[in-house]
Amino acid sequence: QRQMCIRDRVIKHEGYTVSYNSDYKIANWVAYELTSKEATSKKNERSNKFVSDPMVKGATAMNEDYTRSGYDRGHMAPAGDMKWSAKAMRESFYLSNICPQKPGLNRGIWKDLEEQARLWAKENGSLLIVTGPVITDDLKRLGKNRVGIPKTFYKVICTITNGKPEGVGFLFDNKDYGKTPLKSMMIPIDSVEKVTGIDFFPSLPDSIENPM
């Protein structure tokens, strides 16, 4: 398994770090910590201004790639987790943090998971979250900048409770899940690692990479 930061351009922003895939013009992964205070902050509202990431050198996705494509501009690190800082909120709309998502996924179970993660952060004090698309060699492309369209997305969440680490993983195909309950989609982090080839928390023993 590869460690998270090998061979990819890693960019650090205020609220998240992104490993950027310059071929597909989307993230390999986006990682950030979400504290209880950040999860409950109401300081800044959504900016809704999608722009190219100024730290991405070379070709990048543009808003026009998504126009009339049938895909949403789906956040990896959600805007709702960035209300604690105007800069973090603004940077969450960088297109390096965005992937083409079916509207039914982006506005459905993916949004449910974002809201659930904020609840877990409130309860547990702090979460480590890594999220992104599953990168494969055969992704279809979108728009004139040939943005990769992921078939699958993942999210892994880890917390330290009473000195003991716990974690949970999720994998979603790029489709509408209707009324599927979030709980039924929980899997061990280890299962996500097998699909992505990424070792998310190398310093943690495999035994903890089980559902919270």
Please give the residue ranges for each predicted region.
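N-terminal, helix-rich and Lys/Arg-enriched segments in bacterial and organellar proteins
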Residues: 7-10, 30, 102, 171
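Short, His- and charge-rich active-site/binding loops that engage polyanionic ligands
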Residues: 11-73
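Short, small-residue-biased leader/transition segments that mark boundaries at the very start
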Residues: 2-6
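Short, surface-exposed beta-strand/loop micro-motifs that present aromatic residues
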Residues: 7, 15-20, 154-159
